[in-house]
Amino acid sequence: MKMQYRTYYVSSETGNDCYDGLSKTTPFATLKRLQQCKLYPGDQILLECGSVFEDQYLHISDSGSKELPIEIGAYGNGALPKIHANGTGIWYQDYGMLLDSPAHVYRGNVSSAILLYDAQYIWIHDLEITNQESFTTIEAYCAPDKMDRTGVAVVAQNGGTLHGIHLSNLMIHDVNGNVYNKHMNNGGIYMTALKPENEKVTGVARFDGVLVEDCSVWRVSRWGIAVGYTYQHARFTGAELAEETFLQYGQEHILLRNNYVKEAGGDAITPMYALRPVTEHNSADSCACEMNDHVYCHPGERMGKVAAGIWPWKCKDAVFRYNEVRDMKLNQDGMAYDADSGDGTLYEYNYSSQNEGGCVMFCLEEAIHNTFRYNVSVDDLGGILSPSGNPDAYVAENEFYVRRGVPLLRNQMSDGRITLEKNKITMIENENGGQR
């Protein structure tokens, strides 16, 4: 018997929730109506261009298949359909254990405009998403108990290994989350793995196959794009990271490409606990803009007033290429790139400019086997290189255009070991690039 795939149409302009939603002439009116629909492989949800879904959200826990993914996108002409969650779409996040830093928050309510919960083989594209404070709720922007918010949250918990998560051409902005809660689903796009209710039955919660591409993310807090924080973090202690650990407990086949992140309150783009993730052709501008005493003023015991641009956390053989980072704001980090507690990170063919914390850091004792080559740094500030307690790093054939008075090694972050070979260092007078 031939499978009948359904397409659900939704229009805030011409729809009615009493319609069947199965044609452009009989669309639903609200996203709430979709929550009554069970989705099957090959099904589609299409929102009409020009529609605005105010105080609404879309939470999905159904899955497609490798051959027939579920698709959520747009139809018609005009502006992308808009989902303005405004603090709705609240769900409870719980890692089921303390995080790698016990001071970090590991459970609590989260508001997500789009939530994929144990859903796989699903493609979301061509939507505009915001998640600000509700007009009926008074929330101080930097309050310690401010609601965690996401544009798009993806969660693995009770479905074992999730495959085929594809996000493309999303415009996500004005997501006013909690700036202090680093590892809650908090920011533009954030994917996490939580402790399963019965891991012996469902298997380890993890991701194998994530593609985030052509997305624009701006004015979000805390993270721009983060993929892969996991309840299994204790499996990844130490400097040498075994491939087998990632195949069983970490993330695989993570590709983040051609995304733009601007004015994230904290970090721009970070794959986490991933084996050979590829992060390429992305741009970040003016991020870490809330890592300052004016905004980050009530952290309590959470600390965490640090952020960098495009970097990995606890990954093995991560590749970063053809990325660009500008104007990172100064904090304890504040550099464009950061090989952080990973094994075998490779940065090549990247560009950085006027980042207040410098070009690149090799962060602490568990940052090993890292290579930084064929990159260009123009007028980065604060100190170009930050070998901070790392045992090794190979820095070769890069071009550094350094403003007079800016040190090659950042002060108080230069006690690690690096090997410098065939780098071109040119002194410049000022930000306009005039040579001395």
Language-model features: locations:
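Loop/turn elements at helix/coil->beta-strand transitions in domains of secreted/extracellular proteins
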Residues: Q4-R6, Y40-Q44, L68
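Short, T/G/N/S-enriched strand-turn elements that build extracellular solenoid repeat scaffolds
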Residues: K32-K38, F53-G64, K82-A85, Y273
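Extracellular beta-strand/beta-solenoid scaffold signature
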Residues: Y57-I60, W91-L115, I138-N158, Y180-G203, ...
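Right-handed parallel beta-helix/beta-spiral solenoid domain characteristic of secreted/periplasmic
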Residues: L46, S65-D145, M171-K182
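Structural signal for short hydrophobic segments within the conserved structured cores
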Residues: R6-Y8, T26, P81
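Acidic Gly/Asp/Thr-rich repetitive segments characteristic of extracellular carbohydrate-active
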Residues: S12-E48, F53-E54
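C-terminal accessory segments
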Residues: Q435-R436
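Right-handed parallel beta-helix
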Residues: P69, G76-G78, Q120-N131, G160-N176, ...
